[in-house]
């Protein structure tokens, strides 16, 4: 395995240096998970799932978001997880760099791991793992094939459904409101709802678990969600930030994005 060669392929494909490095590390980590017994204890989420679903290099992501399933979220558990991914016969090493950080924001509790990936030639690259716990058992995890430069056919791992991804991004937007800085999430939601398409019943189930029936949310119905999202998405300052080309990975018309999202709840 030659990390530099893999990164160069992604650069030739149009990614900048940082995103090519992140994608190379992503490929290594997902491939190692799929080949290990930890594949049954991990589900992939966040930007990595969005990147795969969209197949669009503009939807870049720097971190790797994972949830543990029936596995302890402790520092020792995390270190054992990383060790398990690298048996002696694998020609790449993973090393945790520095302390494991606690992540706590808006009711979310997780861990951040700074990871160094080193190949047999001594080339090293660094990435971040953001780890959580899959505790919403009614939300079924689905098998998703991830493209990777290390396997021609890709690798299969459990992942959040696109309906869960959509509902979690909407939950965050409603919870934080117009003060949210996660503008890319708005375009993710629009892509899932209006371009990729979602199963209406599956989205309703995900919204019910994550929003309507959640003790820490005020929105109890699609009508409540519509009212809250309408206030947030039509806030003038929020709209200005949405219009920033850096946030708009789709290059979509912002008014069309807002209208498209609200149409699903109105």
Model-predicted segments: where are they?
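Glycine-rich beta-strand-to-loop/alpha-helix junction loops that act as flexible
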Residues: 44-48
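Structured mid-to-C-terminal alpha-helical surface segments
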Residues: 1-42, 52-60, 64-266
């Amino acid at each position: 395995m030659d990390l530099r060669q893999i990164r160069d392929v992604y650069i030739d494909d149009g990614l900048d240096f940082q995103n090519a490095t992140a994608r190379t590390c992503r490929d290594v980590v997902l491939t190692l998970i799929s080949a290990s017994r930890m594949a049954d204890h991990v589900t992939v989420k966040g930007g990595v799932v969005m990147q795969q679903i969209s197949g669009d290099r503009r939807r870049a992501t720097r971190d790797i978001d994972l949830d543990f399933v029936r596995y302890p979220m402790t520092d020792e558990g995390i270190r054992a997880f990383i060790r398990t991914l690298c048996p002696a016969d694998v020609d790449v090493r993973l090393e945790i760099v520095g302390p494991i950080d606690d992540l706590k924001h808006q009711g979310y509790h997780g861990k951040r791991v700074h990871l160094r990936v080193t190949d047999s030639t001594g080339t090293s690259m660094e990435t971040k793992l953001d780890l959580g716990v899959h505790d919403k058992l009614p939300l079924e995890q689905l098998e998703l094939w991830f493209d990777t430069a290390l396997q021609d056919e890709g690798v299969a791992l459990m992942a959040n459904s696109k309906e869960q991804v959509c509902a979690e991004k909407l939950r965050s937007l409603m919870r934080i409101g117009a003060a949210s800085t996660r503008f890319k999430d708005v375009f993710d939601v629009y892509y899932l709802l209006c371009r990729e398409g979602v199963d209406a019943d599956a989205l309703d189930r995900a919204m019910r678990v994550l929003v309507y029936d959640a003790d820490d949310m005020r929105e109890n119905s699609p009508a409540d969600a519509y009212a809250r999202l309408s206030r947030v998405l039509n806030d003038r300052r929020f709209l200005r930030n949405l219009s920033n080309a850096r946030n708009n990975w789709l290059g979509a018309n912002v008014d069309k994005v807002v209208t498209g999202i609200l149409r699903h709840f109105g």
